[in-house]
Amino acid sequence: MQRFSQSDGEFEARVCALTAPMEALDPNLVSSVRDIIAEVRSRGDQALLEFTQRFDQHPAESVSELVFEGDALKAFESQITVAERAAITEAAQRIRRYHEEQITPDWSITDEHGSQLGQRVSPMQRVGLYVPGGKASYPSSVLMNTIPAKVAGVADVVMVAPTPSGQVNPLVLAAASLAGVDQVVTVGGAQAVAALAYGTESIRAVDKIVGPGNRYVAEAKRQVFGKVGIDMIAGPSEIFVIADGTVDPDWIALDLMSQAEHDEMAQAVCIATSEDSVSYTHLTLPLIGQLLILALPDFAETRQ
């Protein structure tokens, strides 16, 4: 963790360097993703399976082994604890209640000329949800993307999520079942985005792709936009916290780590108005970081 003061001689230059926008697209990344998409478009399931074996070291021999739906998906609900199920259920209820307030009804009017004008709001038929599954897994992403779609009336939600070495996270798939996901395919990366956008023998194409992912996923979403809709192109996580002495430093440290843990490119910045605030936060961060490293061992090498 870097720490510097306004009294430092190079303070302004260091702040500018720290907060500078990311550079333009990496041409090697763009080319690699383009090639992956082209392979999936032309060879379908076979390309998807080969990329999954190569990048995720998944032992599957057919795409059908990567698909969970119906009773096979619901079975994961029994693999989580009572406390985990209660937490997912409560979060789902709160998310659903919020998004129900956003529903836009159809309306129509007849103007002075007798013309009928109006708006009809129709849900998409099929939406694809990308859920990260590399360095960490996020059941929250499942809930926050699936539930709005279901509230809107989307008939079919398919979720893709990488499972390195074939290790499925029961909590993520249980969240998918409880949220109403219709099908889960345990593939990830640009190849998963390509499969959602163009379809394969086993995966029907979707109308829109949502959800966060790494830079390969973000670039793939950028390249398939136009063929399908996307929510946005998410960059590395960033957070900027102002510690003005009115907030518990423990919460500041937790907020910083909540974004820094996403990946090694994440950026967490804290501006403190007093030495006391920054000193306490500086002491708390390593403790929280150690807890995070216990939960995510691979995180140690990238963030310490």
Where do the model's predicted regions map?
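Conserved small-residue-rich beta-alpha loop and adjacent elements
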Residues: 109-174
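Conserved small/polar residues in nucleotide/adenosyl-binding loops
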Residues: 281-287, 304
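A glycine- and small/hydrophobic-rich beta-loop-beta segment
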Residues: 262, 270-283
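N-terminal Rossmann-like NAD(P)+-binding subdomain of aldehyde/semialdehyde dehydrogenases
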Residues: 1-125
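Conserved NAD(P)+-binding/catalytic subdomain of aldehyde/semialdehyde dehydrogenases
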Residues: 180-267
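Hydrophobic alpha-helical segments, chiefly the membrane-spanning helices
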Residues: 291-304
